[in-house]
Amino acid sequence: MEGALDTNRKNAIEIKGLGKKYESFNDGESQYVLRDINIDVMENEFVCVLGPSGCGKSTLLNLISGYIKPSDGEIDIFGEKVTKASGRAGMVFQEHALMPWLTVKKNIMMGPKLHHKSKEECEKIAKKYIDMVGLGGIEDYYPRQLSGGMAQRVGIARALANEPKIILMDEPLGALDAMTRENMRRELLNIFQKTQITIFFITHSVQEAVYLADRVIVLKNAAVDCDVKIEMDRPRDMKSPDFAKYIE
């Protein structure tokens, strides 16, 4: 699996002059949590966003999804301005947020049902993504019966079942133990390769970002501090000298 991108691909996400400010509870003055953000994400590109807590990573994701509105600038998804939450991008959170009264299969079928797919289509879509994330055999389990890694796989399958062109991920592996997290990274890259989807991934781990991404964007003091292209083929060895250069 190569890390090179086709430069003829169009932009999936265009962020232009983006700013978000909130009114301070203390003095009533507005304070920017994001300022003058300019980012282009290509179709079928895996981009990781890094930064300390409170730097605006999750706010940026919520702006791209349309859950909140910007104070300045705009965001386009495949050339269309984001004005509200529309379902054009799938979302995966640190907490899987599965419906506890629904089985794995029925959680995954929720999106297709909302898009008025037939029962047969919903079943077919659910099976496709259950198999893709390696959950065959547990489709009738309930969320309480799943490990953290399994539950997060269901969350990813549920997002994919809507068949979006973009997946937005807010530290989806952050709550997992080290071994499960390592396995999930490999699974995620496998899904990325199979689906040719665009992934915009928030993390606080430098190693994780370098392992996964085509590009790593670092946020600091409410702005883009740097944008680094990872010029390494996949799969990547975290112990290699080339990998260490990016960590330094």
Label for each model-derived stretch:
Residues 50-52:
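The feature captures the beta-strand-to-loop junction immediately N-terminal to the Walker
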Residues 73-85:
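Conserved ABC transporter NBD signature motif
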Residues 102-110:
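Short coil-to-helix segment of the ABC ATPase nucleotide-binding domain corresponding to the Q-loop/switch region
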